[in-house]
C-alpha cells in the first residue's frame, strides 16, 4: 500500500522500541520535521529519549503529543507475524504499536507535512512532544519535559494526544479528561507465633479483615458531570511464611484509587488513615501519586476536534474520561486544553495488535483539519 501515513507507521513499527528504548523512532520523526522548519530539541532524561519540536512564532501553541515506546510483545510464536515486522492483511496493519500509538504518530507527522506545505505562513506555533517513556514508569518522559518547559516559561495552549481513544468506529469517542491515580502500600503489623497457640500471637490477617471489609465497601464520592465515582481496587495482598503452622507477623496490602475531581488525593489519604486508626491497627503506609485528574471543558480545542471528526466521519464523538491514565495528566499542568483522539483501541497491548489502514489515513486528515481550525 503506497501511502505516506502507512509507510511511516510501518517504519516506526519495525523498530522494537520496548519502553523506554526508542530504537531510533524519534530520529525518523526528526528527519521528517526538520525540512518543514521545525526547531528540534532533544531532551533525554536517564534512559528515556524525549523530543520537543516547534514551528512558528507568535500566537497560540498547538502541540501534538505521543510516545514511541511500546509494551513487550510476549512470545513471538503467538503472533501470526513477528510483532516488529509490520504486515497488512485484509486492510489491517499488524504489529506491536500499530494502534498504541505508532499509527497515531505517523498520522500526526504526515498531517503536519501537509499542513505546512499548504500554509507555510500559518499563525501561532505547531509543536510536537514525543517520549519513549509512557508505557512503563513514565518518570523520565513527558513529566520531565513539561517541568523543563514550565521552568523556562514555555506556553502551551492546546494539546492533542494521539492515544487510541476510539471504541468501535474511528472518532466515536474522544477523551477530554482522565481520572487521577494514587496507590497505597500498607504494612500491618501483628506478632508471629505458632498456630496452635494463637493467644501468644497476633494475626495481622484477622486484625485487618474489618478494615479491608470497610475499605472495599466505602463510597468515596458520587462522581460529577465529568467523572464516574471514584473507585478503589486491592491489587496485591501478601502475608505468611508459606508454612501452615506459623501465624504471620505482617500483612502487606496494596490498593489503588482512580479518583475524580469530586475528591482530592489528600482526602483519600486522610480517610484511609482514619480507617486504619479506627480499627487500632499498627501500620506503616506509603503513597504514590501517579497523576491528578484533569478535565477539558467546552472551548476552542473541543470544538475543533468535534468539528474535524464529524467533517470526515459524520460522527458526533462521545466525550469520556474513562480508562487509565495518560501523559495528558502532565501536559494539563501547563494550563493547556488537552484532548485525546486516536484509532480504535480493541487490540492494544494484545497479541496481533492491529489498526485499520484506512482509519490511519483518515485520522491524519482529521489531525490536519484540527491544525487548520486552531492555528490558521
Curated annotation (Swiss-Prot):
Give the protein name, as stated in the record.
Succinyl-diaminopimelate desuccinylase
* PROSITE patterns named among the record's database cross-references: ARGE_DAPE_CPG2_1
So where's the catalytic machinery, residue-wise? 69, 134
- Species of the source: Proteus mirabilis (strain HI4320)
Q: In which pathway does it act?
A: Amino-acid biosynthesis; L-lysine biosynthesis via DAP pathway; LL-2,6-diaminopimelate from (S)-tetrahydrodipicolinate (succinylase route): step 3/3
The keyword tRNA processing is assigned to this record? no
Lineage in the entry? Bacteria, Pseudomonadati, Pseudomonadota, Gammaproteobacteria, Enterobacterales
Q: Which residues form the signal peptide?
A: none
Q: Enumerate the residues binding Zn(2+) 2.
A: 100, 135, 349
Amino acid at each position: 500500500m503506497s501511502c505516506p501515513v502507512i509507510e511511516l507507521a510501518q517504519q516506526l513499527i519495525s523498530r522494537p522500541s520496548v519502553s523506554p528504548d526508542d530504537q531510533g523512532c524519534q530520529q525518523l520523526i526528526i528527519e521528517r520535521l526538520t525540512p518543514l522548519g521545525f526547531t528540534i530539541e532533544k531532551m533525554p532524561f536517564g534512559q528515556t529519549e524525549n523530543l520537543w519540536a516547534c514551528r512558528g512564532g507568535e500566537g497560540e501553541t498547538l502541540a501534538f503529543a505521543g510516545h514511541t515506546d511500546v509494551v513487550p510483545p510476549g512470545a513471538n510464536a503467538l503472533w501470526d507475524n513477528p510483532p516488529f515486522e509490520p504486515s497488512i492483511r485484509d486492510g489491517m496493519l499488524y504489529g506491536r504499536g500499530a494502534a498504541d500509538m505508532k499509527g497515531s504518530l505517523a498520522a500526526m507527522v504526515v498531517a503536519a507535512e501537509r499542513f505546512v506545505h499548504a500554509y507555510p505562513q500559518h499563525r501561532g506555533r505547531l509543536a510536537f512532544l514525543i517520549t519513549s517513556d509512557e508505557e512503563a514508569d513514565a518518570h523520565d518522559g513527558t513529566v520531565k519535559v513539561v517541568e523543563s518547559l514550565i521552568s523556562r516559561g514555555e506556553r502551551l495552549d492546546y494539546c492533542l494526544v494521539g492515544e487510541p481513544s476510539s471504541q468501535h468506529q474511528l472518532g466515536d469517542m474522544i477523551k477530554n479528561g482522565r481520572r487521577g491515580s494514587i496507590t497505597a502500600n500498607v504494612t500491618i503489623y501483628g506478632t508471629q507465633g505458632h498456630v496452635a497457640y494463637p493467644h501468644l500471637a497476633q494475626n495481622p490477617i484477622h486484625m485487618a479483615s474489618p478494615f479491608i471489609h470497610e475499605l472495599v465497601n466505602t463510597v468515596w464520592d458520587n462522581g460529577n458531570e465529568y467523572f464516574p465515582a471514584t473507585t478503589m481496587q486491592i491489587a496485591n495482598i501478601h502475608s505468611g511464611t508459606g508454612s501452615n503452622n506459623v501465624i504471620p507477623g505482617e500483612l502487606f496490602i496494596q490498593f489503588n484509587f482512580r479518583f475524580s475531581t469530586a475528591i482530592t488525593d489528600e482526602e483519600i489519604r486522610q480517610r484511609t488513615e482514619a480507617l486504619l486508626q479506627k480499627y487500632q491497627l499498627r501500620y506503616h503506609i506509603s503513597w504514590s501519586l501517579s497523576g491528578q485528574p484533569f478535565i477539558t471543558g467546552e472551548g476552542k480545542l473541543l470544538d475543533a476536534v468535534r468539528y474535524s471528526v464529524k467533517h470526515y466521519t459524520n460522527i458526533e464523538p462521545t466525550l469520556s474520561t474513562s480508562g487509565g491514565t495518560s501523559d495528558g495528566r502532565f501536559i494539563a499542568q501547563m494550563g493547556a486544553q488537552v484532548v485525546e483522539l486516536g484509532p480504535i483501541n480493541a487490540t492494544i497491548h494484545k497479541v496481533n495488535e492491529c489498526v485499520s489502514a484506512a482509519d490511519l489515513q483518515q485520522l491524519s486528515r482529521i489531525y490536519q483539519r484540527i491544525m487548520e481550525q486552531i492555528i490558521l
